[in-house]
Regions:
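Phosphate-sensing "switch" segment of ASCE/P-loop ATPases
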Residues: 19, 162-169, 176-217
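AAA+/P-loop NTPase substrate/partner-engagement loops
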Residues: 75-80, 87-133, 196
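A generic local secondary-structure boundary/capping motif
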Residues: 45, 111-112, 159-163, 175-179
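Substrate-gripping "pore-loop 1 plus following alpha2 helix"
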Residues: 103-108, 135-167, 211-214
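Modules that initiate DNA replication and primer synthesis
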Residues: 1-4
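Conserved AAA+/SF3 P-loop NTPase catalytic/coupling segment centered on the Walker-B
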Residues: 119-149, 175-186
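Pre-Walker A (Motif I) flank of P-loop NTPase domains
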Residues: 67-72, 118-120, 168-169
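P-loop NTPase catalytic core of nucleic-acid-dependent motor ATPases
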Residues: 11-102
Length: 217
């Protein structure tokens, strides 16, 4: 009972210090219009248009807490906004639930701590940075875990040790190139809007951000 009271006190203190954020989160959870509210949050972060992609990205990122999360590859030409979409999505997630990487070597994921990736949003901003780790990424997405046998030295000499890295994860990356079929069959494939209308929306948002009102947001 004492532990329950202490937990209630901690939660009450948190709500007091984070009242606005707490109220906003509750409003979103109770709203039938929650996905449009999410899209509006993207707008507040400077990512305009792309309503469907914003909703899909948010759902994929939050699916990390589920048993079978979604993973995403975003494809577009260079400088079309795919990285901006990923960064905005990461900003809407708890910082400690995001593993944001520039490069992943062949054995890097196998050598992580057992729970380091469990139910995390794993981002590799450009797929080329993880080409060496394609096998481990595919396995983690599909099997929800990585296992390997490594040789460790002990006082009695070398011994074999089983290493386990547990998922599942929601994996997100971007590319301008053709995607390997073995990976594309495991992910949600999105294309960024490169239309003239979307370009105009971006330019308008950039101009608005330079106004006094935009700088005060």
């Amino acid at each position: 009972r004492l532990a329950e009271l202490e937990q209630d006190t901690v939660m009450a203190t948190w709500r007091t210090h984070h009242r606005a954020a707490y109220d906003h989160a509750v409003d979103m959870l109770l709203s039938p219009d929650v996905l449009n509210m999410v899209a509006a949050d993207y707008e507040n972060l400077g990512y305009v248009g792309e309503t469907a992609n914003k909703k899909l990205m948010y759902l994929a990122a939050t699916s990390r807490i589920m048993a079978d999360p979604l993973s995403v590859i975003i494809k577009s030409s260079s400088a079309a906004g795919k990285s901006k979409l990923v960064k905005a999505t990461a900003e809407l997630m708890p910082a400690d639930q995001v593993e944001d990487l520039s490069r992943v070597s062949k054995k890097a994921l196998f050598n992580m701590e057992r729970d380091a990736l469990s139910h995390k949003l794993v981002i590799v901003m450009e797929k080329a940075g993880a080409d060496d780790a394609d096998y481990s990424i595919r396995t983690l997405i599909t099997e929800k875990t990585l296992t390997s046998r490594v040789t460790m030295m002990s006082a009695d000499g070398p011994r074999s040790e089983l290493r386990v890295v547990e998922g599942p994860v929601s994996y997100v990356t971007t590319t301008i190139d053709k995607v390997d079929e073995q990976l594309i069959n495991r992910v949600l494939f999105l294309r960024v809007d490169e239309s003239e209308a979307q370009t105009a929306r971006i330019h308008e948002a950039q101009r608005a951000a330079r106004t006094t009102q935009g700088l005060e947001r």
